[in-house]
Each structure stands twice: as C-alpha cells, then as structure tokens.
Amino acid sequence: MFAVRSMLRAGSRAATPLRAFSTSSMRQANTLLFVEHKNGVINPASLSAVTAAQKLGGEIHALVAGSSSHAKAVAEAASKVQGVSKVLVSTSDAFSALLAEPIAPLIESLVKSKSYTHVVAGHTAVGRDIIPRAAVCLDSSQVSDIIDRKSTRLNSSH
C-alpha cells in the first residue's frame, strides 16, 4: 500500500506530509527512503520523511539518485542524518531531473531485491510523481493523506 502521511516535526506547528509505501505489515519494517535534493542540498521534506520512517521501526536506508556531480554530496549529508543506517547511491544523468520514469523502476528493483517493507518520500511534487509510479511498478495501491500511525493492527478500533 502506498500512503501519504503528514507527520509533525519536533517543535513544529505545521504538519509536513510525506508519501510512503508498504508491502507488508507482518514482518519487521525496513524502509527505503527516497531522498529528494536540488543542487546538492537535501529537501527538508525528506528529513521529515525520516522522522515518519522511524515510527515504522526497523532500518532506514536512504536512496540518493541523481547526477554524479550532486549525488555524492547529498549521499554524504544523508549518511549524517540520525536514523539513516545505510545510504544507497545511484548516479546517472537520467536521474538528474528526479523524474518518475527512470526512478520508479530503480525503486521497484531495490524493493524486490532488498525486501523493503516500506518506501517513503517527502510529500512534494517530486514525491507525488515518483511514488505513485513506483506503486504501479510494484502492483500496489496508494493511500493518501494519512496523518499518523496509531496502531500496527490492521483492524484496530483506536
């Protein structure tokens, strides 16, 4: 299931939405975080997505896709983000514009080969483009505008 989640950052009054994808609720969560960036700087929405991914439990692996000139600097910055246990870097000029067409198949490949249970991205125009296409590639559905996760039980009444 893909979802858009709005999580409150510590000390923030405004909710920062993010997009997430889940393949299973039955096993330990392992999250692939798509890191959005521009000119070598991580988009703040991606940092909010880390906070939400931490609520899922398990490891968080950051995916940095982009041109080689920016991806390395972004990967270094992502490796310093608290909660991120591993950074995956994929460099190609095809990834430089952060378009869904080349990145969604990359996400699909990683989810299938590494058995990620969730994919999370900041709720931005880029996230709204990439995550739904990745859901289609993985034959999954999308759920939008989830505010918070209250329970891990599927049929929870609270």
Short names for language-model regions:
Residues F2-R153:
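N-terminal glycine-rich FAD/FM-binding segment characteristic of electron-transfer flavoproteins
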Residues L154-H158:
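Positively charged, low-complexity/disordered segments
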